């Protein structure tokens, strides 16, 4: 199989599909295999699914550096005056070695420049509205070993900066440009420039720039959406390639190899995060990365994988039955998660409070588990009020996607977590909610209890539009502000899941352990798409089969 991956990379030209609101996340059928004169099959990537249009995929688009930096400047305090300064990343080496990891540019720096090579810096004069990218000069003696960096002219043609200069002069420029009372805005104290002869006292501001950049990055520009769209096109095709071969695979690592090889063949050399290929019990581990266990019949396998395109991430998850059919139990659990995802995606539009989608997913999960008899001895409202569903759906519904797979979310956050103290018999005595960071974290039962209690108390309808939710948005909580509303231009994931139950006596009353035993060995289920918020709704950027009939058709084309 690895030989096939290395040898064949034929590309069929076909534009990727886009999914608008009220359309399901459909799939492309596998392309018919190519044949030669003797009717023997000629292996190529088109056997595994239709690749993205190569001309569209590799189209050169000038990086909108000036647009990005002016967005950032608008988020700084109104009195801001001086120079924004960011150094780029440098090459790194492993300890006691002349080798090192692949270069990875600092994401905030890349957002302002589009420069993806080491040794650079950027300055932006707030008063003059002047953006300069500073690049390293390549010593001719090093070209033999490492090649050359782009020239001044080549860089200027690729990114919309006002000027490109060699980095050796950056400190002299800053010293000459500073005026009395001006500041240098940096992300961290250790990134401040080392100035030899500044004019008077230099004010270094380390507090204003980071929130300004992170807020600017939340709503994507057209360029950023184009790159995320391309990352999704390649990753979607790679998922279809892996799905089409799954019934012939014997180990998780083979699934990983097909996905990674396909992405590389299309020009996406970097994964946005380590590929997760986990079967059976490992399918319930959110960040599983061993990818080395056998694929056993009558289990699920989760493939959570997405490549980068021009530093922009994709994040796609699918769950498939091994070897290629759903048992009754597998179909029931998969349908529950699919319904959670489908209904949450359909609710996406500007103005919706994202955390309300998580709460809706929890309600759907409870309805489905009650239907299957896994939950019992209570109503949907009683089970949700206690937070029991967090044992089955233990992680957040999603996150922003951009230059990071778990991208920044600005001054507000998508979801809430909690620090709680439990009263008698595990009851919630108090819960102190805080805004969670963008990375995926556990959503505790106490958190759900607080969210549900607030919704009931304040009259929210669970759709992010109700009176209670509006009141919560306006009332800036002492714990850290309002819950984030979706805006046009955001790209977020929707990834509900069904996993294990945390065995706590406080929740045992609602759990039918005998019924649950039928589902333990299957493993977890997660389904995840990348969703662009549009003016009136959403667009699903991901094109991978998720409906049961579509999945089986690709796995069993005959």
Swiss-Prot record:
Keyword annotations of the record: Aminopeptidase, Hydrolase, Manganese, Metal-binding, Metalloprotease, Protease
InterPro entries the UniProt entry points to: Aminopep_P_N, Creatin/AminoP/Spt16_N, Creatinase/aminopeptidase-like, Pept_M24, Peptidase_M24B_aminopep-P_CS, X-Pro_dipept-like
Top-level taxon of origin: Eukaryota
Cofactor binding: number and manner: Binds 2 manganese ions per subunit.
Region (Disordered): 1-46
Family: Belongs to the peptidase M24B family.
Gene3D superfamilies: Creatinase/methionine aminopeptidase superfamily, Creatinase/prolidase N-terminal domain
A single BP term in Gene Ontology: proteolysis
Biased composition (Basic and acidic residues): 1-15
Compositional bias of kind Polar residues: 34-46
GO molecular function: manganese ion binding; metalloaminopeptidase activity
Identification of the protein by name: Probable Xaa-Pro aminopeptidase PODANS_7_5850
Cofactor(s) for this UniProt protein: Mn(2+)
Comp. bias regions, Low complexity: 23-33
Record field: catalytic activity: Release of any N-terminal amino acid, including proline, that is linked to proline, even from a dipeptide or tripeptide
EC number(s) reported in the record: 3.4.11.9
Residues bound to Mn(2+) 1: 315, 495, 528
Residues reported in the UniProt entry to bind Mn(2+) 2: 304, 315, 528
Key word Ribosomal protein present: no
Function: Catalyzes the removal of a penultimate prolyl residue from the N-termini of peptides.
Pfam family name, one: Peptidase_M24
Organism: Podospora anserina (strain S / ATCC MYA-4624 / DSM 980 / FGSC 10383) (Pleurage anserina)
